[in-house]
Amino acid sequence: MMGVLKSAIGDMLMTFSWVVLSATFGIQTAAIISAGDFQAITWAPLVILTSLIFVYVSIFTVIFGSASFNPTGSAAFYVAGVPGDTLFSLAIRLPAQAIGAAGGALAIMEFIPEKYKHMIGGPSLQVDVHTGAIAETILSFGITFAVLLIILRGPRRLLAKTFLLALATISFVVAGSKYTGPAMNPAIAFGWAYMYSSHNTWDHIYVYWISSFVGALSAALLFRSIFPPPRPQKKKQKKA
C-alpha cells in the first residue's frame, strides 16, 4: 500500500510540474527565437520545441524516475502486459495525476505575469465534438503505440529513447493542433478544463477522456498482439 501511495504522490508532483513547465513552452520558444534572431527560419519553432521537450523529459526522468503524468500511458502499459501496476494501483495513480494537473494549471495562471497570460493555455476543442473525438482517438492511438514501441522495443540508450519520444510527441501535437489542441493526455486536459470550469461537461469527458482511453487502450492491445509479453515460467516441483 505504501508503495502505491508513493507512486501516486510521485505522479501528482510530476504532473503538477509538467503542466507548469509545458505551459511556458510557447514563451520559451518565442524568447529563444527572439534572442537568436531566428524569425526568418520557418522551421525554427518546431526544432526549438522538440529540443525543449527532449531536455525537460530527460530532466524529469532523472528527478521523478518511473512516475507518470499521463493516465492513458499508465493504463496502456498495464494492458500491454508490462509488470508494475495493478487495477488497484491505477485506481489511485490516475486521480492523483488529474489532481496534479489541476493544481499545475491553477498555479501557473496565478503566478505568471499578466503580460504572458495570453501565451498560456491548454488543449481546447477546435472542431465539432464528434470530429474532435475521432481526432483524439486517432492521435491517442498513434502516440501510445509509438511510446510503447520506443520504450519497450526501441534503442537501449536512454537519450536515444528520449529523443525519439520528443520527436513523436511534437509530430502528433502538430498533427492534432487544428482539432483538439491536442491533449492525448486526459489529466492535462482536465487540469486546464478545471481552470475554466468545463471539466464536468459531456464534451470534455467524451473527447478528452473516453476517446483518449479508447485510442490508447486499442494501441496497447494491438502492441500486445504483435509483441506478447513473456509467459511466466512455472517453477519445477522437486520430486520427493
Swiss-Prot record:
Membrane protein topology class: Multi-pass membrane protein
Compartment(s) of residence: Endoplasmic reticulum membrane
GO molecular function: water channel activity
Motif NPA 1, chain ranges: 70-72
Transmembrane segments: 13-33, 44-64, 89-109, 132-152, 163-183, 203-223
Signal peptide: none
SUPFAM superfamilies documented for this protein: Aquaporin-like (SSF81338)
Motif extent (NPA 2): 185-187
Expression sites by tissue: Expressed in roots and above ground. Expressed in elongating regions of the root tips, trichome cells of the rosette leaves, vascular tissues of the flower petals, stigma, stamens (anthers and filaments), pollen and the top and bottom (receptacle) of siliques.
Keywords, in A-Z order: Endoplasmic reticulum, Membrane, Repeat, Transmembrane, Transmembrane helix, Transport
Domain of life where this protein originates: Eukaryota
One CC-aspect GO term: endoplasmic reticulum
Family: Belongs to the MIP/aquaporin (TC 1.A.8) family. SIP (TC 1.A.8.10) subfamily.
Stated role: Water channel required to facilitate the transport of water across cell membrane.
Domain remark in the UniProt entry: Aquaporins contain two tandem repeats each containing three membrane-spanning domains and a pore-forming loop with the signature motif Asn-Pro-Ala/Thr (NPA).
Protein name: Aquaporin SIP1-1
Lineage: Eukaryota, Viridiplantae, Streptophyta, Embryophyta, Tracheophyta
